[in-house]
Structure formats: structure tokens, C-alpha cells
């Protein structure tokens, strides 16, 4: 490992990544028993789908298909984080008014939510072969809704939760609202109609 770090310093590193990042990635790679992975190799992997030719689906048709899938499910994996801290929480959701809504008693996801509004959530089917892939990744902004505000009470009504019952709880239920910024959709079935299996919706 020392030889590889020395090589980075002598040769001036690879690509444009800061020296500290390259050294950190070298240590991580060696400690995990893997080969030496450069910044450029990480970037190439990250950009894999960006560089693929895309045959876009008509936006309205895509949105209709995505909405049907979202409404046919009720559980997502919600990723939150701040600094080196990350959390991924399975949580029930509802979707209305173009946003995702989640009631939560609490938990460590709020460590990230306090300091970082940027979140990601995923809805997906279990793997059943490459021809049956179906998933949505949502990048969005999270807000906490004020307890017993009009917005809070409206969602409680949609969930058929009596507001008076909620008011009797020792601590109010937290209501998380996620506004989508981008949805990355992967449906194998799109290929049957001549479209790319991966589609993107920007909001």
C-alpha cells in the first residue's frame, strides 16, 4: 500500500482528483483486497448510463406509467444522510399532489433530515430476471410538515387517521414530505415498445 501511495505522489496522481481523495481511495481499495481504482475509473463507472444512447419515451406516457407504478406500491427505501452519516429506512408512503408523504414516529433518519434536505428514495420489485426489472429512484428535497397544520391534517385525512386521535399521542407523529427533483426509471418492458429501459423525468 505504501508503494502505491508513493507512486501517486511521485507521478502527480491520475486525472484531476485531489491528492487526498486518491490516497483515500487507494487505502480503501487495498484494505478491501481489491485492485487499484483511480478517480477516472470511478468516474467512468458513475457515468456509464449517461454515455448510453437513450431512446426517450413520450413524457406524458412515461409519467402515466410511473404514476401507476407508484400508486400500486406503498413502501419505499428512504436514504438520508449528513457528512459521513448515512441511513436507509424502509417506510410506508403515500403519493399525492406530486409529492411523497410519510408518517414516522421517529428514528435515526432524522439525524440526516435535520442537516440535509437532499434525500433519495427507491421503489422496486424483487429481482425476477433481467427481462422483468422494475424500479424507480427518486432524488428529492425533504421537508417536515408542522404537526396539525392544514397540510398535516389533510394528509391525515387521506390516510384515514383521525386528527383527534393523533393529538392524544404523547409525541406528535412526524410527517415527512419529499418533493421530487428527478426520477430515474428502469422498466425492462419499455424495450418491447422500442424505448430504452432506463428513462428520466426531471421536475
Question: What is the role of each PLM region?
Answer:
Residues 9, 27-31, 35-58, 134-203:
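Charged, gly/pro-rich active-site loop segments
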Residues 13-22:
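Intrinsically disordered, low-complexity segments enriched in serine/proline and basic residues
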Residues 58-69, 73-75:
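Short, basic/aromatic recognition patches
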Residues 71-77, 157-160:
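Short Pro/Gly-enriched beta-strand edge/turn motifs at strand-loop
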Residues 73-106, 121-125, 134-136:
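Short beta-strand segments
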Residues 113-114:
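Intrinsically disordered, low-complexity effector-like regions enriched
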Amino acid at each position: 500500500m505504501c508503494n502505491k501511495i508513493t507512486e501517486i505522489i511521485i507521478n502527480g496522481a491520475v486525472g484531476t482528483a485531489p491528492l487526498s481523495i486518491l490516497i483515500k481511495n487507494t487505502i480503501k481499495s487495498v484494505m478491501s483486497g481489491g485492485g487499484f481504482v483511480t478517480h477516472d475509473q470511478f468516474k467512468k463507472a458513475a457515468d456509464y448510463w449517461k454515455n448510453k444512447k437513450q431512446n426517450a419515451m413520450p413524457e406524458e406516457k412515461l409519467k402515466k406509467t410511473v404514476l401507476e407504478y407508484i400508486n400500486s406500491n406503498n413502501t419505499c427505501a428512504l436514504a438520508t444522510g449528513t457528512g459521513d452519516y448515512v441511513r436507509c429506512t424502509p417506510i410506508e408512503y403515500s403519493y399525492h399532489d406530486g409529492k411523497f408523504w410519510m408518517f414516522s414516529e421517529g428514528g435515526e433518519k432524522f439525524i440526516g433530515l435535520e442537516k440535509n434536505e437532499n434525500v433519495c428514495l427507491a421503489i422496486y420489485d424483487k429481482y425476477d430476471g433481467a427481462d422483468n426489472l422494475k424500479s424507480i429512484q427518486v432524488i428529492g428535497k425533504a421537508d417536515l410538515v408542522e404537526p396539525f397544520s392544514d397540510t398535516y391534517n389533510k394528509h391525515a385525512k387521506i390516510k384515514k387517521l383521525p386528527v383527534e386521535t393523533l393529538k392524544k399521542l404523547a409525541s406528535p407523529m412526524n410527517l415527512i414530505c419529499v418533493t421530487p427533483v428527478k426520477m430515474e426509471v428502469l422498466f425492462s418492458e419499455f424495450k418491447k415498445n422500442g424505448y430504452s429501459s432506463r428513462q428520466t423525468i426531471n421536475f
